[in-house]
Amino acid sequence: MNKKKTPNNIEDLLSLFSETLTPADVLSAKLMAQFSNAITSERLNLNMSQKDFAKHINATQSLISRWECGDYNFSINKIAEIAAKLDLNVDFKINKCH
């Protein structure tokens, strides 16, 4: 009996598709997941519902939902705009992979 392993994190999930994803696809997915998680964490730290959080930063609840579930391709400008509204620092580190 061959039991399939359920992915526990983004790396496990991405490894399932490693033959069809480029390294850029993998990196992009990881970065979007990190930013989505940061937005969700900040909302939860503020003890706000998605609806209240949307009002707080002048967005819609459906947009907050898309941000949090990773169904949004953030531009650098959008990341900067969200971070400024939430008084968050964004730090990109660029290093050699190997």
What are these regions (language model features)?
Residues 47-65:
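Short alpha-helical DNA-recognition segment
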Residues 1-38:
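N-terminal flexible/basic segments that precede or flank functional cores
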Residues 39, 50, 61, 76-79:
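Helix-turn-helix DNA-binding elements, focusing on the entry/boundary residues of the two helices
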Residues 77-93:
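DNA major-groove recognition helix of helix-turn-helix/homeodomain DNA-binding modules
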Residues 43, 54, 83:
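The alpha-helix within a helix-turn-helix
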Residues 33, 43-45:
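Short amphipathic helical patch at the helix-1/turn junction of helix-turn-helix
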